[in-house]
Amino acid sequence: MKLIPLASESLGVRSLATFLEIGKIGILIDPGAALGPKRYSLSPAKAELEALQKAREKIQQYSRKAQIITISHYHYDHHTPFFEGIYESSSPEKAKDIYSRKTLFIKHPRENINFSQKKRAWAFLKEAEKIVEKIEHADGKFFDFGDFIMEFSPAVPHGSEGSKLGFVVMVMVDDGKQRLIHASDIQLLNRASKEWIIKQMPDLLITGGPPTYLEGYRVKEAWSTGLKNLNEIIKETNAEVILDHHLIRDKRYPEFLEQLEKQALTFARFLKKEDRPLEAYRKELHKIEKGEEAEVPFDVGWYL
């Protein structure tokens, strides 16, 4: 199984888009990318818009190599919608290019879902159903493809128990040599997702940490809970970990990584690149773009 990370916060955008290659089969997981419309009361910096364009090109490129697409939930950083979106770099044409003639394994659009995601799922499926090969509601199901298997978790909370953000599904892919879990927005904050991951005994876990960047959020509690849960997963499974997404929107994410029982990589580090947590440093990027002095822990010469 070959893993190709496509987009994430360590690569400059909101996403956890992933491509897996197993023989001649391509699996595209959560094919979406987006930017936070407001952070520090600021719109995205020029560097973020450029990173989004690069992420979009990657997702479009690898969608053409995929026969299977999985969608964990209906937030726009996890699927490409059928509308013109500046901060999603989306359009009907791009969506058609991604989903046409594909088999989709998706979070159930009507069960264990909040009102906002139900509306988004309806809008997405209204268009997707016209062009896809097949759609499977994947929650809690197992699929055998001969050379590999895919198993989806039941719907688990998007974050902590009782989260108003709804539910997501995780996916496990096993080709007989490696067992990988992609756990997008569990945020490492609920018991159901932790227990399902441990039960699956993955060799590699791709996941996002708690959203400790949110103002007014119970940051201390989320930090300690996320850390405790991930360390428990590491102890029980000895899995290699790729940790990215929400956590990387917090400038302090390196401290979280240092407190883990085992070294974790971001998507950028897996690709042997430097982390570019652009959203976390949006304030500084705006200053740099105005010609003012500001420090960021990554190279900015690539877009200036």
From Swiss-Prot:
SUPFAM superfamilies: Metallo-hydrolase/oxidoreductase
Top-level taxonomic group: Archaea
Family affiliation: Belongs to the UPF0282 family.
HAMAP family on file: UPF0282 (MF_01406)
Protein name: UPF0282 protein TSIB_1029
Organism: Thermococcus sibiricus (strain DSM 12597 / MM 739)
